[in-house]
A protein has these predicted regions:
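A short acidic, glycine-rich active-site loop
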Residues: 57-69, 209-222
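Small/aliphatic-rich secondary-structure junction motif
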Residues: 2-57, 155-207, 230-232
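Structured loop/turn residues at secondary-structure junctions
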Residues: 14, 90, 116, 165-166, ...
């Protein structure tokens, strides 16, 4: 499969247990793929010091102290797994600080808790996490609390549900998985296509069961074709599934039923799956899922 190249994660931390779960995710990830490194980042907004006369050294010392406290649990988790990490503390807007680090620190993937707390505004979808998903071009994995790994064995984290609809945006999720396999990460993929149900009656005519099955199969196979070829070309173990229904609900339902440890999807898509569009299907999946969701742009 190739040489194990260190995979570098950016983990925003703010002292909340949700942000600590992001560090736990990376620690569990490393159980199957030891070649991991992490950059922990904590940002303190300028308004944290509203009544202070700016004194560069004094404020930066306090920023470092706050960042050290906010990252304590995350650092303990990573150290216990002997993961190499570095802590960055910055004074500034959290979104800007995270986005800059994603660009400048040779990061492969951003991993964020779905919610946060404290003086650093919440890492809640719709706020910092939501903005980062839009701002950075890297894959972003959203990890839910209190502990996304409670039900999962270490290997299950690498049983991935990958949702595709045949669009180039969805195929980026497939390429993400393909690269993981080439890098040496052991993965098993459940490749799914969700087809919108045929209306019960169209122009007064209801389709037969055979007609419906043929429709779903033909549309699903077409949407899955390129993804199947891409995964098969590098020896990824995968199964295909074609299901009719609400895309977000079915993605989450299948992930649970197939005992997947993570959902991977493109942030934009078109076609019969109603579009895996951030703010629509992908946004709903992030809210509905109990397991980590990786969004690939």
């Amino acid at each position: 499969m190739g040489t194990l190249k260190p995979r570098r994660f950016l983990i925003p931390v703010d002292g909340s247990f949700q942000a600590d779960r992001a560090a736990e995710y990376v620690a569990r990830y490393a159980e199957a793929f030891p070649a991991c490194e992490a950059v922990l980042i904590n940002a303190q907004p300028a308004e944290t010091f509203p009544t202070r006369t700016p004194d560069g050294k004094e404020i930066l010392v306090e920023v470092d102290d706050l960042g050290s406290k906010a990252s304590a649990a995350a650092r303990t988790l990573l150290s216990a797994r002997h993961l190499k990490y570095r802590l960055i503390t910055e004074l500034g807007n959290p979104v800007e600080v995270i986005a800059d680090a994603a660009r400048n620190e040779e990061i492969d993937e951003v991993v964020m808790g779905s919610r946060g707390s404290g003086r650093w505004e919440s890492l809640i979808v719709g706020s910092v996490t939501h903005k980062i998903i839009h701002r950075v071009s890297l894959p972003v994995t959203v990890v839910h609390g209190p502990s996304p790994m409670q039900k999962a064995a270490p290997g299950d984290l690498h049983r991935l549900l990958v949702a595709v609809d045949g669009s180039k945006h969805a195929l980026r999720a497939v390429e993400y998985v393909r690269k993981l396999c080439v890098a040496g990460l052991p993965v098993h993929v459940e490749l799914i296509n969700i087809v919108l149900p045929i209306p019960e009656s169209y122009a007064g005519i209801s389709p037969s069961a055979d007609q419906s099955d043929n429709y779903y199969r033909s549309h699903g196979e077409l949407a899955l074709q390129n993804a199947s070829e891409a995964l098969g070309s590098v020896g990824v173990a995968f199964r295909t599934h074609i299901v009719a229904g609400d895309p977000a609900e079915k993605i989450v339902e299948l992930a649970e039923g197939l005992e997947c440890g993570r959902i991977v999807m493109g942030t934009r898509g078109l076609g019969s799956a109603a579009g895996l569009l951030l703010g629509s299907v992908a946004h709903r999946v992030v809210h509905l899922a109990d397991i980590p969701v990786t969004l690939v742009r």
